[in-house]
UniProtKB/Swiss-Prot annotation:
Span of domain Tyr recombinase: 90-242
Origin species: Streptococcus gordonii (strain Challis / ATCC 35105 / BCRC 15272 / CH1 / DL1 / V288)
Major place of residence: cytoplasm
Name assigned to this protein: Tyrosine recombinase XerD-like
InterPro entries: CB, DNA_brk_join_enz, Integrase-like_cat_sf, Integrase_catalytic, Integrase_recombinase_N, Tyrosine_recombinase_XerD-like
Source organism phylogeny: Bacteria, Bacillati, Bacillota, Bacilli, Lactobacillales
Membership in a protein family: Belongs to the 'phage' integrase family. XerD-like subfamily.
Physiological role: Putative tyrosine recombinase. Not involved in the cutting and rejoining of the recombining DNA molecules on dif(SL) site.
Length: 242
C-alpha cells in the first residue's frame, strides 16, 4: 500500500515541504491503521484528538484525499471519509462570503469540481445537476435549461462555467454511467472529495448554495429575483437573508 503514497503524491503539484508533510502524514496513517476499515479509521481519528486542531485538520485532509485516491484507483473497495473538526472561527463564517477562487484551479476530482461550480455559480441542487442532459446546455447562448418538479427554468451561465461545461458535455446526461444519470450518493461523494482536496471539507452542497445567495445579494439583487432563479415558488426560505 505504501507505493500508493508515491503514486498519489506524484499526481499533485506540491512544493518540497508539502510533499514531505504529505508523505510523513500518510506513512504514519498506514502504519497506524493497518487494514483500512471503519473500525481502524475511527481509532485513527480518536488518536488525533490530543493534537492541536490545525494539526488534526491537516492530517485528516491529507488522509481524506488519499482515501479517495485509493478508492478511485481500486486499492480499496469502499469509499471512506473522516470527519474534519470545525473550530469556532469556521462556524462563525456561516452567512459570510468566502473566497472560493481555488475552485477554478485544476483538480484530481474534475466531476466533483464541476458539481461544486454549478452550485456556487448558479445555486443548483444536486438533484437538478444530476438531471441535466447535454441537450439542455446551449453553449452558444450560455444558457442551461433546468427542470424541477416538472417545471423548467432557464439559467444564465458565466463564460468561465460555459467553458468548463464544453469540456465535459458528452453523452446523454452531463453526469452519467452507461446512459443513465449517477445517483445522489455518487454526487455527494464526488463533491466531498473535491472539497476535501481544496481544504474546504467543512463546506457542503447546502453551504455552497448559501454562498450563491450571498453573492447575489452582494450584487444588489432582490430576494424575489433570487427565488425565481433558484426555482422557488416564494421567498419564504430566503427571509432570513433580509
Amino acid at each position: 500500500m505504501k507505493e500508493a503514497i508515491d503514486q498519489f503524491i506524484q499526481q499533485k503539484q506540491l512544493s518540497k515541504n508539502s510533499r514531505l508533510a504529505y508523505t510523513y502524514d500518510l506513512e504514519q496513517f498506514l502504519e497506524q491503521v493497518g487494514t483500512i476499515n471503519d473500525t481502524s479509521l475511527r481509532l485513527y481519528q480518536s488518536s488525533l484528538q490530543s493534537l492541536k486542531l490545525s494539526v488534526q485538520k491537516r492530517k485528516l485532509s491529507a488522509v481524506n484525499q488519499f482515501l479517495y485516491f485509493l478508492y478511485n484507483q481500486k486499492y480499496i473497495e469502499h469509499y471512506y471519509k473522516l470527519n474534519i473538526p470545525k473550530d469556532q472561527k469556521e462556524n462563525s463564517s456561516q452567512g459570510s462570503l468566502l473566497d472560493l477562487s481555488v475552485f477554478w484551479q485544476e483538480s484530481q476530482v474534475p466531476q466533483g469540481r464541476l458539481i461544486a461550480l454549478l452550485i456556487l455559480e448558479n445555486g443548483l441542487l444536486p438533484s437538478e445537476i444530476l438531471s441535466i442532459k447535454v441537450a439542455d446546455i446551449q453553449l452558444d447562448f450560455q444558457i442551461l435549461s433546468v427542470e424541477k418538479a416538472g417545471q423548467k427554468r432557464i439559467v444564465q451561465l458565466s463564460s468561465k462555467l460555459t467553458e468548463e461545461l464544453s469540456r465535459m458535455a458528452s453523452g446523454t446526461y452531463l453526469f452519467e454511467k452507461k446512459g443513465k444519470p449517477y445517483s445522489r450518493q455518487w454526487a455527494f461523494r464526488q463533491l466531498e472529495a473535491f472539497l476535501s482536496e481544496k481544504g474546504q471539507a467543512g463546506l457542503s452542497a447546502q453551504s455552497l448554495r448559501e454562498q450563491y445567495i450571498l453573492r447575489q445579494l452582494k450584487d444588489k439583487r432582490s430576494l424575489h429575483d433570487i427565488a425565481r432563479d433558484l426555482g422557488l415558488k416564494s421567498i419564504t426560505t430566503l427571509e432570513k437573508y433580509r
